[in-house]
Regions:
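Charged DNA-binding/catalytic regions of mobile-element recombinases
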Residues: 1-158
């Protein structure tokens, strides 16, 4: 059975927790946050940023982590009129696009660097997500970058 890659980022003294809001169609990372706690606050901040900067989705899919089932998180989605979808418990394949981003991030960035602290991890991950969105082509997108594919879709939809 496939196992989730977990969005835990190793640092010299412990772990940081990563959340990313990803557009499934284009694979574009719309917003992300890194935190030293699993509280829902950093997830809510990433969600609010994505909703402020990009068109509202019809459906929002997450796993059943406590930060995503928290009232603080789900109330933002409900307040925006977004349908909440959650993966089956322990079914990482239900959220395959997010799992793929975690795998790419870990093998192309995180495992290649030893972050001393949260600031260093945040800088490295920020550079990687810029690369991922703007430079790294995806076979499933016809070898376009997520950003180019997203913007192409947005242009034709307008």
């Amino acid at each position: 059975m496939p196992r989730p890659t977990h969005p835990y980022i190793p640092m010299a003294h412990g772990f940081a927790y990563l959340v990313a809001i990803i557009d499934w169609y284009s694979r574009r990372v719309l917003a992300w946050r890194l935190s030293n706690t699993m509280e829902s606050t950093f997830c809510v901040e990433a969600l609010q940023e994505a909703l402020a900067r990009f068109p509202k989705p019809t459906i929002f899919n997450t796993d059943q982590g406590s930060q995503f089932t928290a009232e603080a998180f789900t109330s933002v989605l409900r307040g925006a009129g977004i349908t909440i979808s959650m993966d089956g418990r322990g079914r990482c394949i239900d959220n395959v696009f997010v799992e793929r981003v975690w795998r790419s991030l870990k093998y192309e960035e995180v495992f290649l660097h030893a972050y001393e602290d949260l600031d260093e991890a945040r800088a490295g991950i920020g550079r990687y997500f810029d690369f991922y969105n703007l430079v790294r082509p995806h076979q499933a997108l016809g070898y376009q970058t997520p950003d180019a594919f997203y913007r192409g879709v947005a242009l034709t939809a307008a």
